[in-house]
Amino acid sequence: MNQTISSRAPQKRLAPRLLCVMIGAALGTLSASSWAAAATDSTAENAKKTSATAATAKAEDSKTNDTITVVGAQETFRAGGNDLIPTYLDGQVANGGRIGFLGQQDARNVPFNVIGYTSKMIEDQQANSIADVVKNDASVQNVRGYGNPSQNYRIRGYNLDGDDISFGGLFGVLPRQIVSTSMVERVEVFKGANAFINGISPSGSGVGGMINLEPKRAGDTPLTRVTVDYGSASQVGGALDVGRRYGDDDQFGVRVNVLHREGESAIHDQKERTTAVSTGLDYRGDRARTSLDVGYQKQTIHHMRTDVAIGGATVIPEPPSSTLNYGQSWVYTDMETTFGMLRSEYDVSQNWTVYGSVGASRNEETGQYGAPMLTNNNGDATISRLYVPYVADSVAGLGGIRGHFDTGPITHKVNLGYAANYRTTKSAWNMSGQEDTNIYNPGVIGFPQTVMGSDSQDPQLTSQVRASGLSLSDTLSMMDDKVSLMLGVRRQEVTIRNFDSGVPNSAGSLDAMKVTPIYGIMVKPWEKVSLYANHIEALGPGKSAPYQYNGKPVVNAGQIPGIIHSKQNEIGVKFDNQRYGGTLALFEITRPTGMVDPATNVYGFYGEQRNRGIELNVFGEPVFGTRLLASATWLDPKLTKAADSANNGNDAVGVANYQLVFGGEYDIPVVEGLTATGTVVRSGSQYANEANTLKLKPWTRLDLGVRYTMPMKDTSLTWRANIENVTNERYWESVEDSGTYIYQGDPRALKLSVSMDF
């Protein structure tokens, strides 16, 4: 155990503490100013209540049955910029989100499938990470990393690395692997290929969709919220969320979030610690709008239960007890990130706006990793230790001009944008030999000694990746916006330089360019119904060629063949009557895959995976006091051109052939402020190899909860209790793309919290 401690990077505690002290001082100033505004706020609140009472009386006069229809009046929304889509009814869902460089868009007005999940949902479900949020969407599979705790995703059957989640439309700014939700206002899921709007992500993932996060902003109403929470088995946390606006017209805003949580998780002996601090400043003038977001996050996991490598198993074994930790005490990870983003836009005229943003981050990670590798079907395995320090520095930018003009009966909405991201990574490694273990009876293994490693244990340069693209779009609207046609083109470049412990690897370099189009159409035959179709593509750099294939040298070993060019066609229908809405979509995405041609022993994009699917999502409040959030995805993921021709027509690795999510809330009438919640998730089977001889069974998980909002004088108190995996199901949740690792679902866990607003 002493060896484990000695191998860690020095702990950096001074900066976060100083930052917390500075924020505390700022909060004291904010609190003092809030007392001065209390009388004004009280008057405004009384006016709101009077208005609401009048509206209710009017509704009573006009109703013809026992059903009460509640339609929320949406606030002013400027499409194309950074203003967030107004929330839907109770505030948990927004029907739209960021469409890359096209900015925030209402889903009813664009030929794409996009939805946003809000901070209210995050709070009500006590969702601590992005994975906790997107589990509400059947189009998204939660997938884990390669022997580490990283949260990856699979959208429409294709992988999205956690490193490739965007922040305000910028890649590479967020913490990697796991992102805390404490500073997040929106989690937006764009479903489908997205090269035209987003370009190439740093890792090249996101063929089937993208996740974007938007930061919290100070609202018009002053906010001071203190939250205390508890989670199984002994995690305790506290959070502070403060927002204020200043100026004659409330043009200046400040939002501060502070979080700390630590303790043992529901998995035995696995201890987790999270610290996150963020500050968001913004200015909203008549013509200029700007914002600055800075943040710090540190996450530590000790005695971590990682994935299980399939290894020599010929069948997928039954999962162990859901709480059993088959990791070892020396397995840990420490991840620390400092990041920031600056965004601005300026209206040069009534019809034209220039915009720009820039962001950067530094990620530092160190850890001792060890995942059991099965040697037979009885749970026997071997485990070895891998030490990997890792450093990544990223910077990204976006700029352009958007506007609109008319040519006769046609309105043109034009956007010209340029985006770029650049990332450098450094790493080192050492590893031990193998030790025997068993996933059902892991025992205790001492810290294994190093037997091999890189020349230097200080992280050395391993890669440099730069991606940039110039995009032009024109959305033509006619017939009072009942018909719109989106046309666009993007010129995308990518440059990759790989290194071997700081030494350039000329074979692993790439300089490539692709031009990718977009065309989509939206037709509104009725006020509440929209029909749409699109063709859009995805781009990403391929992997380096292997050095050997079937015991023979590969001709272009180590080389990157070029850019993988995937294509999507989609049609769908959307419905929205401001009480409830939804989308039904049918799509096909084809993606080339890398493989060695047996005839020439040359590596190239000779393979192909084709995913065809149907998506359905429904949200809203069809009956007053009853809210629904449900979705379903059916996929036919086929290997149309496999490395082994005998596998042609088989299902792709790791893609569940269906996933169903049914969530709901019910306001209990007899107790004002009391709400019962529940979510059922059903996932279909997944194959763990291309031969389709290894298969993960379908699984079902039930989550239940209750919350109670207790009004108090000048404050409100909200109690929340959630139980995840109520029946404590044992199941293998997912398998990663190569079929190497399977990951076990989390055990039953209790979450409790109380929040006070004052």
UniProtKB/Swiss-Prot annotation:
Signal peptide location: 1-36
Disulfide bond sites: none
Membrane topology note: Multi-pass membrane protein
GO terms, molecular function: siderophore uptake transmembrane transporter activity; signaling receptor activity
Domain of life: Bacteria
Chain positions of motif TonB C-terminal box: 741-758
Entry keywords, A to Z: Cell outer membrane, Ion transport, Iron, Iron transport, Membrane, Receptor, Signal, TonB box, Transmembrane, Transmembrane beta strand, Transport
Domain (TBDR plug) ranges: 106-216
Motif (TonB box): 66-73
Location within or outside the cell: Cell outer membrane
Domain spans labelled TBDR beta-barrel: 221-758
UniProt induction comment: By iron starvation. Iron regulation mediated through the Fur protein.
GO cellular component, one term: cell outer membrane
Family under the similarity heading: Belongs to the TonB-dependent receptor family.
Role noted for this protein: Receptor for the hydroxamate siderophore, ferrichrome. Binds also to most other ferrichrome derivatives except enantio ferrichrome and ferric rhodotorulate.
NCBIfam families: TonB-siderophor
Protein name according to UniProt: Ferrichrome receptor FcuA
Gene designation: fcuA
